[in-house]
Amino acid sequence: PIEVNDDCMACEACVEICPDVFEMNEEGDKAVVINPDSDLDCVEEAIDSCPAEAIVRS
């Protein structure tokens, strides 16, 4: 599964790249995973694009 750790800086890159998997939390200060078992190609792109390296596979 995919998760976003506390290093997230809310840049929203993952949400823009892969909106079927990531969204911002209600406070808008962290991305959250809405589809943790997704194998969409955009997940790898989101992981590679995260400036905080906050997206991890568990």
From Swiss-Prot:
PROSITE patterns: 4FE4S_FER_1, 4FE4S_FER_2. The modification Cysteine methyl disulfide is found at residue 11. One of its GO terms (molecular function) is 3 iron, 4 sulfur cluster binding. Disulfide bonds join 18-42. [3Fe-4S] cluster binds at residues 8, 14, 50. Binds 1 [3Fe-4S] cluster in its tetrameric form. The keyword Nucleotide-binding does not apply. It comes from the Bacteria. Pfam families: Fer4_13. Homodimer (ferredoxin I) or homotetramer (ferredoxin II). This is Ferredoxin-2.
